[in-house]
């Protein structure tokens, strides 16, 4: 916004990530001290809040321990649909990728089927570990999860969506 800084009229200013209303947890690439440099795709003149992806709405619910079915985005959506007498449309899950059978690579024994009635595994090859997309990092940070890398972040993202804990492991270490 237009203003005066030390008596000089200015159309904008340089700010740290904290001065822009965020923090280094959401933007780990931001310098610890100093000016935050926006990504190349930032639109000149656009609100910093919008450019940083902070214009999203975050709703916090206080879920009691007897409602574990609501410990996920899908669970909250199902409950909201029931509360407001609306239709619930669960996400459509499709299986893509290779047709390899995980049992050909690893053996899993469920020791207590009452506690774990179903166990699923998939083989994913040719993964390059690196940073997650910015949109995913921001969504994880908005629910209090620190982004780590694409592999860890995708399991955390799915956990938040479905309430199911996932684990990614190197096949040779299982």
Regions found by a protein language model. Name each.
Residues 1-171:
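RNA/tRNA-interacting regions in translation and RNA-turnover enzymes
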């Amino acid at each position: 916004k237009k203003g005066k800084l030390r008596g000089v009229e200015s159309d904008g200013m340089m700010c740290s990530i904290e001065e822009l209303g965020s923090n280094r947890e959401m933007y780990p690439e931001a310098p610890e001290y100093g000016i935050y440099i926006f990504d190349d795709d930032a639109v000149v003149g656009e609100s910093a809040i919008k450019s940083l992806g902070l214009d999203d709405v975050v709703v916090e619910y206080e879920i009691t321990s007897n409602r574990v079915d609501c410990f996920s985005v899908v669970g909250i959506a199902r409950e909201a649909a029931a509360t407001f007498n609306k239709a619930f449309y669960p996400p459509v899950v499709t299986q893509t990728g290779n047709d390899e059978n995980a049992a050909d690579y690893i053996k899993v024994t469920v020791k207590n089927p009452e506690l774990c009635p179903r166990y699923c595994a998939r083989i994913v090859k040719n993964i390059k570990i690196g940073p997650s997309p910015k949109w995913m990092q921001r969504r994880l940070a908005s629910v209090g999860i620190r982004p780590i890398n694409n592999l860890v972040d995708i399991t955390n993202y799915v956990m938040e969506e479905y309430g199911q804990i996932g684990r990614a492991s190197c096949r040779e270490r299982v």
